[in-house]
Curated annotation (Swiss-Prot):
<keyword id="KW-0800">Toxin</keyword>
<feature type="disulfide bond">
    <location>
        <begin position="21"/>
        <end position="34"/>
    </location>
</feature>
<protein>
    <recommendedName>
        <fullName>Conotoxin Cl6.16</fullName>
    </recommendedName>
</protein>
<dbReference type="GO" id="GO:0090729">
    <property type="term" value="F:toxin activity"/>
</dbReference>
<feature type="disulfide bond">
    <location>
        <begin position="10"/>
        <end position="22"/>
    </location>
</feature>
<dbReference type="GO" id="GO:0005576">
    <property type="term" value="C:extracellular region"/>
</dbReference>
<keyword id="KW-0528">Neurotoxin</keyword>
<keyword id="KW-0960">Knottin</keyword>
<keyword id="KW-1015">Disulfide bond</keyword>
<feature type="disulfide bond">
    <location>
        <begin position="16"/>
        <end position="27"/>
    </location>
</feature>
<keyword id="KW-0964">Secreted</keyword>
């Protein structure tokens, strides 16, 4: 089960706080960064 930030839909990691990974349209909570 992936820890999604359900309130933060994204199209890429640039949409996520702290440059976190974007997976399946949602930001991952427990990812330090995503290149």
């Amino acid at each position: 089960q992936w820890p999604f930030q359900q309130w933060a839909p994204c199209t890429g990691h640039w949409d996520c706080p702290g440059d976190r990974c974007c997976f399946a349209g949602y930001c991952l909570e427990t990812t330090p960064s995503c290149d």
